[in-house]
Amino acid sequence: LAADGIAVAAVSRSLRAGDGALAGSLEETIAQIEADGGRAVALPFDLTAPGTDRRDIIAQATEAFGHPVDIVVNNAAGPRHFDVLFPDMTWEAFHEAVQTNVWAAWDLAAAAVPGMRERGAGWILNISSSQAGPRLGPPYAENPTNGAVLYGGTKAFIDRITTGAAMELYEDNIAVNTLAPEYQVATDNALTVAGVRKDNSEPEETIAEAALALCTGDPKKLTGRIAYNLSLLVELERPVRTLDGRSTLPGWQPNEIDSARLRVPYTQTSRIL
């Protein structure tokens, strides 16, 4: 987004390096964006803290940039608990996952809608997961925790909210979509999950490019999608650039992507009617 000239308000609990369990921080992110000529502001915020008013994020971003927010990307995700079967899931774990994966996205999007209406257009993107889809079988995978009931359930919830919100906000010229990686993206967080390796994952640039397409497309045409990154890139014939936007990414251009990797044939859309 920043490489495309969009001012970015980055939100995270980790303001400085070492604040969180994973590498990276808001300060490092802002420094990288500014070094590449972009404009960004850091908003340290814990979306799960009790009593948190998430509307403050939208208000602070609006004040920082001097105009209403017109793009919201909900990328926060709560605990997966893949190792816990649904009869053993605690109420606390369920509540935390719903608060982070569903309510946080709902609150932030809803808080931004008035400003989007004021500006005459807006884009809401919720990052989803292939875990939201139905588990196919029998036969099922040998590992029963692949059911991912809690994490997948919350992502399915946000998918359905997205398509409904797209319908409700269509006349306001506000696009609402979800985007998921075709398989997995080799982020630091993903690499902590068993079986995820850099050599069997997709580069970050593919989902970043697909997200940019959904956050800048015509709200009257590109909305209500339950989209997968590679399928969307092939459908739109969209070049995949490096994160700084200066060059294209070898091996991951639409004409180089193996069709066997696609969950949705490029001649179809993943729209739910």
Please report, for each region that a protein language model flagged, where it lies by residue.
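Hydrophobic positions on the long internal alpha-helix
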Residues: 57, 73, 104, 108-112, ...
